[in-house]
Amino acid sequence: MLKRSMNIADYDPVLWQAIQDENRRQEEHIELIASENYASPRVMEAQGSQFTNKYAEGYPGKRYYGGCEYADIVEQLAIDRAKELFHADYVNVQPHSGSQANAAVYGALLQPHDTILGMSLAHGGHLTHGASVSFSGKIYNAVQYGITAEGLIDYEDVRQKALECKPKMIVAGFSAYSQVVDWAKMREIADEVGAYLFVDMAHVAGLIAAGVYPSPLPHAHVVTTTTHKTLGGPRGGLILSAAKDEDLYKKLQSSVFPANQGGPLVHVIAAKAVCFKEALEPEYKVYQQQVVKNAKAMVDVFKQRGYNVVSNGTENHLFLVDLVSHGLTGKAADAALGSANITVNKNAVPNDPQKPFVTSGIRVGTPSITRRGFKEAESAELAGWMCDVLDAMGKDNEAQVIAQTKEKVLAICKRLPVYA
């Protein structure tokens, strides 16, 4: 018999200590990784529910197992809320991750060796948009587009590449692009060459849900997202469309199950349902507006302090700092800031002279700091601290500056906890 008094602390103290250490790390470090966020206690409660135990192969009303009546309620709730949130007429909440959602879209609409045209990973795209090390670059003939010296998508270059390679699908979306994508222009190019337009909006889904960033739904044939970045929900994936194409929807349904996945994670779908309900609340829009304000405030400080920001600014939740002119690598900057309890990630910049695991830039994102209550003033102050650390790298006072910055970080983290 399983007793509710069972706990990890008594049974597995080594694992329990790692959990406690991670809890402390999140509370005492400032999180600036653009793809991370803090899930609400409600979301985590759903993920820890007894839906963890339930197998539910199939879809609501069409399951292969019995006892799915409550799983059906949960999944339909998530579907209906996502439809309302994103103004979609098709939603699949079963993908376990964004990459698996993308794989399902490719599987539904492409054959092996078909040509896809996606944004280069080195220029801000994602592994699954055709990178050679990804399944998307191995199974399909992947052609890549990039950004200009100013850090902007060159739509005429995208068009010319599309006319040359005649892709079956154009992939729009990004993991490190700080400007607004012209979804309508991308659809225009796709239509010109007879291609599907597939948009991966994982990074900006929360902004889109709040109306802070343009939605690709009116333009794309199909859209995917994760649920844990700007959306702030559980780790998972989502497929959506507003194409009013039942044949397309049938292909997508069967590509998720049974082609790419077996049983869905019902406890995670329950958490997605909670996340979508939270995103429909009025205060969610205020949060997403603040995410962008905070990013802009940080950009202003970096520029004032003499650091080059790719594309010269941001219109979303993230930005890239190019460290080439300062003679710093992204790897070293990541480590130095990490020593001051500021977590970023190293990131390639356009025409990066360094290797992918070294890089010449850092990516900075504001969803997490905004979640814990940072406004423009705190964000600008934080950017100043980061510049202090970067300025001191390689100098005699580096250790002293890092120690002083860490004290400031610990103080503001105590004042603005993640979970109060």
Swiss-Prot record:
Binding residues for (6S)-5,6,7,8-tetrahydrofolate: 121, 125-127
Site label Plays an important role in substrate specificity, positions: 228
Presence of the UniProt keyword Isomerase in the record: no
Pathway linked to the protein: One-carbon metabolism; tetrahydrofolate interconversion; Amino-acid biosynthesis; glycine biosynthesis; glycine from L-serine: step 1/1
A single Gene Ontology CC term: cytosol
Keyword terms: Amino-acid biosynthesis, Cytoplasm, One-carbon metabolism, Pyridoxal phosphate, Transferase
SUPFAM superfamilies: PLP-dependent transferases
A biological process term (GO) from this entry: glycine biosynthetic process from serine
Reaction catalyzed: (6R)-5,10-methylene-5,6,7,8-tetrahydrofolate + glycine + H2O = (6S)-5,6,7,8-tetrahydrofolate + L-serine
Subunit structure: Homodimer.
Function noted in UniProt: Catalyzes the reversible interconversion of serine and glycine with tetrahydrofolate (THF) serving as the one-carbon carrier. This reaction serves as the major source of one-carbon groups required for the biosynthesis of purines, thymidylate, methionine, and other important biomolecules. Also exhibits THF-independent aldolase activity toward beta-hydroxyamino acids, producing glycine and aldehydes, via a retro-aldol mechanism.
NCBIfam families for the chain: PRK00011.1
Annotated protein name in UniProt: Serine hydroxymethyltransferase
